[in-house]
Amino acid sequence: MAKLTKRARLVRDKVEATKEYDFNEAVALLKELATAKFAESVDVAVNLGIDARKSDQNVRGATVLPNGTGKEVRVAVFTQGANAEAAKEAGADIVGMEDLAEQVKKGEMNFDVVVASPDAMRVVGMLGQILGPRGLMPNPKTGTVTPDVATAVKNAKAGQVRYRNDKNGIIHASIGKIAFESNQIEENLAALIEAVKKAKPSSAKGVYIKKISLSTTMGAGITIDQASLTAAS
């Protein structure tokens, strides 16, 4: 049997796998257990009461976190003309059309988010096999295919998170850094949960949000008592 690392032993001793923790207690535990030498992200996993095999029950969208993600986001925009100038003024890192597509084909993708105006999708559409697997393909549901590219750029820079459930009906997202204050993490989580609730498929039956777990980049998941979320704010 492999030896447990010092951190793994600490997690085992501190975190009860079956317990639902008060939100503030959970964040305090995460901070105590965050021993990595880099600024760890705070990640959330939201288990949904959906049948992920049915396309009409899949949940997808985007929301801007009130306190940002703590990450510097690089944004590439596929557009032209006046929209190109608007994107640059809004803070886009790279703006182009066919020239940007050529960079992508060469594997030069020094960006975290891709935005496209509708007229640019003829170019972006040919990059689906490259951008899709990396989670970078623009989509109207996440606000990244839009005629208002300037707002999309500003949202991305302000800490917008894009979310979608995986094949097990779980949404994974980063909602800040471990250095954030507890109330900042709670406000970000509340914004994400509110957006996910609004995106509830009409065909989903029963309990919609079944479980919420928080973890850090290198840490174990801690299940949150949902009743404590409103009490924490």
From Swiss-Prot:
PANTHER family from the UniProt entry: 54S RIBOSOMAL PROTEIN L1, MITOCHONDRIAL (PTHR36427), LARGE RIBOSOMAL SUBUNIT PROTEIN UL1M (PTHR36427:SF3)
Gene Ontology process terms (BP): regulation of translation; translation
CDD domains assigned to the protein according to its UniProt record, in alphabetical order: Ribosomal_L1
Molecular-function annotations in GO: rRNA binding; structural constituent of ribosome; tRNA binding
Family matches, as HAMAP family: Ribosomal_uL1_B
Family: Belongs to the universal ribosomal protein uL1 family.
UniProt entry keywords in alphabetical sequence: Repressor, Ribonucleoprotein, Ribosomal protein, RNA-binding, rRNA-binding, Translation regulation, tRNA-binding
Source organism per UniProt: Pseudoalteromonas atlantica (strain T6c / ATCC BAA-1087)
Subunit structure: Part of the 50S ribosomal subunit.
Superkingdom classification of source: Bacteria
Function recorded in the entry: Binds directly to 23S rRNA. The L1 stalk is quite mobile in the ribosome, and is involved in E site tRNA release.
InterPro entries associated with the record: Ribosom_uL1_bac-type, Ribosomal_uL1, Ribosomal_uL1-like, Ribosomal_uL1/biogenesis, Ribosomal_uL1_3-a/b-sand, Ribosomal_uL1_CS
Name by which UniProt lists this protein: Large ribosomal subunit protein uL1
GO cellular component, one term: cytosolic large ribosomal subunit
Matches recorded under Pfam families: Ribosomal_L1
The UniProt record lists the keyword Ribonucleoprotein: yes
